[in-house]
Amino acid sequence: MKKTTIINAQLSYAIATLGHTETLTLCDAGLPIPNSSNRIDLALTKGIPSFLETLYAVTSEMFVERAILASEIKEKNPEILTALLAHLSQLATKQGNQIPVEFVSHEKFKKLTHDSKGIVRSGECSPYANIILVSGVPF
């Protein structure tokens, strides 16, 4: 059995096989996931796991180069945004890089998810709790 954080086989595989600039989307329970996408459904019940718990676990194993968020999160979910940005700042320090954050419309965000190597659905039930993580290289 693995000793590292993530023990979900699908999620572990998705992270392990990411190449430079490939993306992984983490989303709330309501984001539409295209049928053609690699859906990694972690949602168990409302709020379990939370978006932030999912983000913390994924970023413990993934080197993040940049992130993409829907601009609507600024107005509709400032609490999650504040925690998310604080986490990305701490992660950047730990990784020794900057993690630029790009804000796009929710419609554009949904289109960008089509290119993700995986879409990880959490049990989060708050608006716009979604992020596209762009994979970097740790060297």
Swiss-Prot record:
Location within or outside the cell: Cytoplasm
Enzyme class: isomerase
EC number(s) from the headed UniProt entry: 5.4.99.62
Substrates-to-products reaction catalysed: beta-D-ribopyranose = beta-D-ribofuranose
GO CC, alphabetical: cytosol
Active site per UniProt: H20 (proton donor)
Alphabetic keyword roster: Carbohydrate metabolism, Cytoplasm, Isomerase
Binding site for substrate: D28, H106, Y128, A129, N130
Gene Ontology molecular function: any one: intramolecular lyase activity
Pathway: Carbohydrate metabolism; D-ribose degradation; D-ribose 5-phosphate from beta-D-ribopyranose: step 1/2
Keyword Transcription listed: no
Record-annotated membrane-spanning stretches: none
Location, primary (coarse class): cytoplasm
Pfam families: RbsD_FucU (PF05025)
Gene Ontology annotations of biological process type: D-ribose catabolic process
Ribosomal protein listed as a keyword: no
Gene3D superfamilies: RbsD-like domain (3.40.1650.10)
Quaternary structure, from the entry: Homodecamer.
Matches recorded under HAMAP family: D_rib_pyranase (MF_01661)
Function: Catalyzes the interconversion of beta-pyran and beta-furan forms of D-ribose.
Similarity remark: Belongs to the RbsD / FucU family. RbsD subfamily.
Protein name stated in the entry: D-ribose pyranase
Naturally occurring in which organism (per UniProt): Actinobacillus succinogenes (strain ATCC 55618 / DSM 22257 / CCUG 43843 / 130Z)
